[in-house]
């Protein structure tokens, strides 16, 4: 019999809690990640008040320097720790795949200076369309169509760009390049980015509509991902008949592998929390696992190095935690964590190699305290033990510490 009938894992994308031991091997604009500290630096520079996470014990997590504006709790309502990554990458897919039990020894490729001519030329030859070279770099998805959408409408060129993650994205106006044509181009791009030196996690079709100054991305987005290289705990759960619910980009990250119910993409963190709450309320969801990603921290504020915006985004999530609690059952377990860091005060614009926090809460807890410090995959090992399935490659369960 399961200790918890339902477990809900919420990933606060990029909310790291201090430099990892191997941060000296990871860089931002030539600066090693050794002094990165997403939560710590936001707390120091912008002020951070997250009373609901603080009550669970966020301020009690072991750190060289305590979080400046987050108090410790003498009698927290949950259990906390921080977890270290073993995989050789600090991107979204690597973090999530490791959380679900995999050790990624060959990280995906990222292209901070844009894609090489060889790839661009192949796409041009296949599609019969030119690529706007000036867009070929890490770019905000909305900014890139604002900057190059008018030109595309005139010329029919492709907007090819990337991000901090191992992705190639192609944006096209639906009236200029039909969606089906865009999909065919993306399928081809997928076929040429399956091995080094261009091993990419996802190819994303990004259709948009509108007029210059008022472009809008449409729901016809399509992701061409790669599945995890072996079964994760999601697969073990699904194979055992345990329902799995994906909220946000989780389904894309795992290419649908091990996901039995995809609840759709998030328009924003707030929309993602709404979807999570709707998932919690589903009458048929009496047992199983939900997995939510909230990406605004990372996409809107981490990469843009905006500590005040990041702070406000954390406040927004914390303010809505009581709603999540109110929709949980007595025997539910909530796990709040991250997938990497993205210190908005740091050099460069890339992710940062950090520990991630872990907060565990259940109305059924009679105890509280610290969970032994471990690794990302301990989360999936705990989920696996709870539901009586095997772990994946790595991970040590902390289920026995939750009283």
Curated annotation (Swiss-Prot):
Keywords from the UniProt entry: Cytoplasm, Isomerase, Manganese, Metal-binding
Q: Which family does it belong to?
A: Belongs to the phosphopentomutase family.
Which organism does this record belong to?
Answer: Streptococcus pyogenes serotype M12 (strain MGAS2096)
Keyword flag Transmembrane: no
GO biological process terms, alphabetically, are:
2-deoxyribose 1-phosphate catabolic process; 5-phosphoribose 1-diphosphate biosynthetic process; metabolic compound salvage; nucleotide metabolic process
What's the catalysed reaction?
A: 2-deoxy-alpha-D-ribose 1-phosphate = 2-deoxy-D-ribose 5-phosphate; alpha-D-ribose 1-phosphate = D-ribose 5-phosphate
* UniProt cofactor(s): Mn(2+)
Q: Where does Mn(2+) 1 bind?
A: 13, 339-340
Q: Where are the transmembrane segments?
A: none
Which Enzyme Commission number(s) are listed? Answer: 5.4.2.7
List where in the cell it is found.
Cytoplasm
At the highest ranks, the source species' classification is:
Bacteria, Bacillati, Bacillota, Bacilli, Lactobacillales
The protein depicted here goes by the name: Phosphopentomutase
């Amino acid at each position: 019999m399961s200790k918890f009938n339902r477990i809900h894992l919420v990933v606060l994308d990029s909310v790291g809690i201090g430099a990892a031991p191997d941060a000296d091997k990871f860089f931002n604009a030539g600066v090693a990640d050794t002094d990165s500290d997403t939560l710590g630096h936001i707390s120091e520079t912008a002020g951070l008040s997250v009373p609901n996470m603080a009550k669970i014990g966020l301020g009690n997590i072991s750190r060289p320097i305590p979080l400046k504006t987050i108090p410790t709790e003498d009698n927290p309502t949950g259990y906390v720790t921080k977890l270290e990554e073993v995989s050789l990458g600090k991107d979204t897919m690597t973090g999530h795949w490791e959380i679900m039990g995999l050790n990624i020894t060959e990280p995906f490729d990222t292209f901070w200076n844009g894609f090489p001519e060889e790839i661009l030329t192949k796409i041009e030859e296949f599609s019969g369309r030119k690529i706007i070279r000036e867009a070929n770099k890490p770019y905000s998805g909305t900014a890139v169509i604002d900057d190059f959408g008018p030109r595309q409408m005139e010329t029919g060129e492709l907007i090819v760009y990337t991000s901090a993650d191992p992705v190639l994205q192609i944006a096209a106006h639906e009236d200029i390049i039909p969606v089906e044509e865009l999909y065919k181009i993306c399928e081809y791009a997928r076929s040429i980015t399956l091995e080094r030196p261009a091993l990419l996690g996802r190819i994303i079709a990004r259709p948009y509509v509108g007029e210059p100054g008022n472009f809008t991305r449409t729901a016809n987005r399509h992701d061409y991902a790669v599945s995890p290289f072996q079964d994760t705990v999601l697969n073990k759960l699904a194979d055992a008949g345990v329902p799995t619910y994906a909220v946000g980009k989780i389904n894309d990250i795992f290419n649908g592998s091990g996901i039995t119910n995809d609840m759709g993409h998030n328009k924003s963190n707030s929309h993602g929390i709404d979807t999570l709450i709707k998932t919690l309320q589903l009458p048929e969801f009496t047992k199983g696992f939900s997995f939510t990603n909230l990406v605004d921290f990372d996409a809107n504020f981490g990469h843009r190095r905006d500590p005040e915006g990041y702070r406000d985004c954390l406040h927004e999530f914390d303010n809505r935690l009581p709603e999540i609690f109110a929709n949980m059952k007595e025997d539910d377990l909530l796990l709040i964590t991250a997938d990497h860091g993205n210190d908005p005060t740091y050099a460069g614009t890339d992710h940062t190699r950090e520990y991630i926090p872990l907060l565990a809460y259940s109305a059924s807890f009679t105890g509280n305290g610290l969970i032994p410090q471990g690794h990302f995959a301990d989360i999936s090992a705990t989920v696996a033990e709870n539901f009586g399935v095997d772990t994946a490659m790595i991970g040590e369960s902390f289920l026995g510490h939750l009283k």
